[in-house]
Amino acid sequence: SGEPGSTSSFYIRGINTFGGVATPLILLDGVEISSGDLNRIPAESIESFSVLKDASATAIYGNRGANGVMLVTTKHGKENTKATVNVSVEASYFQPMNTPEFADGPTFMRTYNEAQQARSATAITPRYSDEIIAATESGINPYVYPNVDWYDMIFRSGNYNQRANVNVSGGASRVTYYMSLQANHDTGLLNAADNSAFNPNINHWEYNFQNNISYKLTNTTTVNLRMMAQIGSQKGPNNKTTDIYKKVMYANPVSFPAYFPGEEDHIYYGNAEIKAGAYGENPYQYMMGSFREDNFNTLNTSLDISQDLGFVTKGLSAKVLVNFKNWS
């Protein structure tokens, strides 16, 4: 959807599905994860990323790989290396490349009258009189004669996002480690009046922790512990930004004001919806009418033991893997 915090969708073999599922099988260090989990993994923590499809996927993973397989491997430390610390901080500004231009109230009313007359073979009384058009143009009373630029009122010109990541890696003769901590802060493009009871703009915070430790019990036995923790929150309107945008596209500038003045810290909305000659709902009310806050946390931990069986047959090895995942 493009909203802050929304997950990505992955399609390897197109939208056609096998077994009613279109998304590929995603394996992180050999453990199946969701696209949402993958979306939150910092790029700095990924060692390799590969894609399997068709026969190469089904030969190994059977029907589970019918829609393709994504193999993701996270980074790990190297033996006998000093600790290496990497820090990155990013600040970005996003702005729509193209924004629509809307007619103001007087232009809309004159154009509406012309279109109304063009559809009739005889002279008709225009929907908007010259007096109403003149009053709207003068701005004498914006609550009685509204002239609302819905797009300019509801959407900001751009938004700022921030991201910070710090990771440490290294190792000794038998143990290696890699640890990463990342914080993300993303905001949306929604705006509100100064006397609004709350800020409707999407505010998304996210923290990710990755910890990979490998220890050699013997020269042929290795234990790997991997832990990925993700926590975050998102605040914003209950209605999606795409739906709010649609309401802006449908509304005209003169049917009703965005809101009526009330107390210092409160406002009263105009008509939520009009019927005769309707041009949709009040976009501002649609945005401000409900508020939502979501909190999430995910813990994904795996432990595997690898045993080299080269003393039996060259190239032979065995691996036991246990995984635990908890989310809410």
PLM features: what roles do these ranges have?
Residues 1-11, 15-25, 31, 38, ...:
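Membrane-proximal, glycine/serine-rich, low-complexity loop/turn segments characteristic
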Residues 26-27, 87-88, 317-326:
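Extended hydrophobic secondary-structure segments that form protein cores and membrane-embedded regions
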Residues 53:
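Flexible N-lobe loop architecture of eukaryotic-like protein kinase catalytic domains
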Residues 314:
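Glycine-rich, aromatic-lined ligand/substrate-binding cores of catalytic
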